[in-house]
Every structure is written in structure tokens, then in C-alpha cells.
UniProtKB/Swiss-Prot annotation:
Gene3D superfamilies the record matches: Metal-dependent hydrolases
EC code: 3.5.4.4
Pfam families: A_deaminase
Record's function text: Catalyzes the hydrolytic deamination of adenosine and 2-deoxyadenosine.
Annotated Gene Ontology cellular component terms: cytosol
GO terms, molecular function: 2'-deoxyadenosine deaminase activity; adenosine deaminase activity; zinc ion binding
Name this polypeptide is given: Adenosine deaminase
Catalytic reaction list: adenosine + H2O + H(+) = inosine + NH4(+); 2'-deoxyadenosine + H2O + H(+) = 2'-deoxyinosine + NH4(+)
Cysteines joined through disulfide linkages: none
Source species: Salmonella paratyphi C (strain RKS4594)
PROSITE patterns: A_DEAMINASE
Active site: 200 (proton donor)
Amino acid sequence: MIDITLPLTDIHRHLDGNIRAQTILDLGRQFNIALPAKTLEALIPHVQVTSTEPDLVSFLTKLDWGVKVLASLDACRRVAFENIEDAARNGLHYVELRFSPGYMAMAHQLPIAGVVEAVIDGVRDGCNTFGVEARLIGIMSRTFGEAACLQELDALLAHREKITALDLAGDELGFPGSLFLSHFNRARDAGWHITVHAGEAAGPESIWQAIRELGAERIGHGVKAVEDRALMDFLAQQRIGIESCLTSNIQTSTVASLADHPLKTFLEHGVLASLNTDDPAVQGVDIIHEYHVAAPAAGLSREQIRQAQINGLEIAFLSDGEKRALREKVAAA
């Protein structure tokens, strides 16, 4: 179902949600960190979703083992590099990797700005090695509160030229976007793009708030948008992108089944929705699975899947010239 004549993108992909189980095992041994299992086979159920989780917060606990083993900046650099290697193996031409430096730093009190630098270095080296094009999106983990998010923002701004956009992720219900207005004002002043996790756990009002108050140009997940016809019209008219993550939304119990997923409705309504993975290592999926298995199960026709692939580049945080160059590169391959 992937059109090989078009660029393949993944623009909603958490770097810190894509730490390989083998890497968790390796780093656990290297730093003498107690893990819930001593073999790869036994570890996987602890670090990968093997069935549907009851809610988003339960799903997010599966991510914790990946960051618990980040005991050095070199470890952060390694997982960043491996993220690009994984993208190349999946056949991705362009990837936007988002990461929460405070979350990655937390378990071992690493310097947050140092984590940002390590991720930048690892991604750069990976791109040079594997020929994938990538951009970085900084995440503020709202679950840890306003002050912690300010620390993350300051660390990201210290490397502002290497960061493309700012995101807000975590407990959407407990920490609404209204708490972070000043944070996003600073991000926009820095010239960054804005994408926000919204309409995943909370309703359409969370999406409206992300757009109107935080300046969101894209929405992560946004599944609740279909509950508000005016919002759907607005998204289509204003060309605000939706970063859809099919398998993830089922695993977090955000959507009951793939057949119930709103991606098809988004596309039928003219909303610029794209196909993405979210947390591939934790979910046990890759972008190929999303196109070949999840999208057809969600009722998408071949042409709708192709449109979602086109949308992925259309709403990417790239200039028109960069998009054109990527299209030409893939077409000539």
C-alpha cells in the first residue's frame, strides 16, 4: 500500500518511545540497573504493549523502562542514532523525531541541556550514516508540571537552531494547554513550528485551545475532532494537519477498534491527516505495518492511503523547497 514513487514520512514518532528492547537490556547490564527480566524474550512483555492498555497513562508506563537505563549522555546519543537506523530500515525518507529531554534525564539526573545536545549529535550522526532526512521536535512533558516544562523549554532553546518545533505531551486531562501559554509564546518567538497532542484523552475543546491559544499548526492524534463539525471544517479550511497513529490509538484505548478510527473520516472531510507510528518499539509496530495492515483495517481505500502518504510530506515542518527536493530525490531513485 506504500507508493514507492512518493516520499515515505513519519512525522509523529517519539524518539524516547522507540528504544529497542535489546538496547534496554544492553544498557541495563552496562550500568548495573535492575531490570524486570534478564533475557530479551522475558523483557519484551515489560517494555512492549502486548494487549490493549486501559488508558493512555497505563500505556505511557511501558515507556518508562526505556528511559530508566539512560544513565549517561552517551546512552542518549546511542538511542538517538538507533532511531535513525530504525527509520532507514523501515524505508523512511523523512522523519520528525520528538523527544522530552526532561523525561530522558529524570531517572539519573542527567543535565537536561546535555540530553538535548546528545540527541542532536546522535541524530546527526545517524542521518550522515544512513541517508535519512530528519528534524527534531522538542516535547514538554505536561505531566510533570509547568516548572519542569520550563526547564525543558530552556534546555531546548539553548539549541534552538537544531530544533524545528515544540510539542506538549502527557496527561492531557490533568494538565490542560492553558497552563502553558507563556511557554508557547517563547517557542513561537524563537521561530519554531508548533504541534500539540490534543483531542486524544480530552475532547474537541482541547484541540480548539491548542490552535487558538498555543498556536498549533498540527495536532497529534486529534481523534475527538470528529465530535465537532465546526472544528472539522476549520481543520480542513485552515490546512491544520492531523498526525494520526492508528495502532497507538487502539492500544491506549483512545479508540475502540481500527474500524472505529476517524482517519477515514478526516480524509473524506478534506483534513490533511497523515499516517504515523507514535512509539514503535513500545507498540511492536513499524510504519510498514501501519500502511499495510492498520490502514486497510481502518477502512481506508488504496487511494486514501496514498493521500495520507502525500499529506505526510505536505504537513511536514519543511520549506516548500525542501519538500520539492525530497519529492525529486525519491522520484529519481
